[in-house]
């Protein structure tokens, strides 16, 4: 599993002109599921992302997690994160999980985040989405489960 996480002041996702998920301050998580991912990868990433101390404390140091701040998490599926662009001019997506497996693990990740007591919103799996965000920092990380 590969995730791009961005600290945001706010973020939303729109499908067919309708907002399907939004948060205030917190994290936007773009999540890609690989073909060899398992339930343990979803749990690992959910724990890592929600515990990562990337929010500033009163001294201005990155010392607080999204759990500590009470922020929200917006999770958006993005299989293109698994693209291999090393050869040729067209990305290869053979490392990405097939849709049924990817959706199941995406939902497992979302559930694991919710189980940590965080306000959690999502996009629509497999849909064309418009994602809006106001970066905070900007602070952006790429995290992998393997």
Curated annotation (Swiss-Prot):
Keywords, sorted A to Z: Cytoplasm, Hydrolase, RNA-binding, tRNA-binding
Key word Hydrolase present: yes
Pfam families: Tyr_Deacylase
GO CC terms, sorted: cytoplasm
Top-rank lineage group of the source organism: Bacteria
Family the UniProt entry places it in: Belongs to the DTD family.
Domains: entry comment: A Gly-cisPro motif from one monomer fits into the active site of the other monomer to allow specific chiral rejection of L-amino acids.
Described purpose of this protein according to its UniProt entry: An aminoacyl-tRNA editing enzyme that deacylates mischarged D-aminoacyl-tRNAs. Also deacylates mischarged glycyl-tRNA(Ala), protecting cells against glycine mischarging by AlaRS. Acts via tRNA-based rather than protein-based catalysis; rejects L-amino acids rather than detecting D-amino acids in the active site. By recycling D-aminoacyl-tRNA to D-amino acids and free tRNA molecules, this enzyme counteracts the toxicity associated with the formation of D-aminoacyl-tRNA entities in vivo and helps enforce protein L-homochirality.
The protein's name in its UniProt record: D-aminoacyl-tRNA deacylase
Organism of provenance: Desulfosudis oleivorans (strain DSM 6200 / JCM 39069 / Hxd3)
């Amino acid at each position: 599993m590969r995730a791009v996480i961005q600290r945001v002041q706010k973020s939303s996702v729109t499908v067919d002109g309708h907002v399907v998920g939004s948060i205030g301050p917190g994290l936007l998580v773009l999540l890609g599921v690989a073909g060899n991912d398992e339930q343990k990868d979803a749990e690992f990433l959910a724990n890592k992302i929600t515990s990562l101390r990337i929010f500033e404390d009163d001294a201005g140091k990155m010392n607080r997690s999204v759990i500590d701040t009470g922020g929200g998490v917006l999770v958006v599926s993005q299989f293109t994160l698994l693209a291999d662009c090393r050869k040729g001019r067209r990305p290869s997506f053979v490392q990405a999980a097939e849709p049924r497996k990817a959706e199941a693990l995406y939902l497992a990740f979302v559930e694991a985040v919710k189980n940590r007591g965080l306000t959690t919103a999502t996009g629509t799996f497999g849909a064309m989405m418009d994602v809006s965000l106001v970066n905070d920092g900007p602070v952006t990380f790429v995290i992998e489960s393997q």
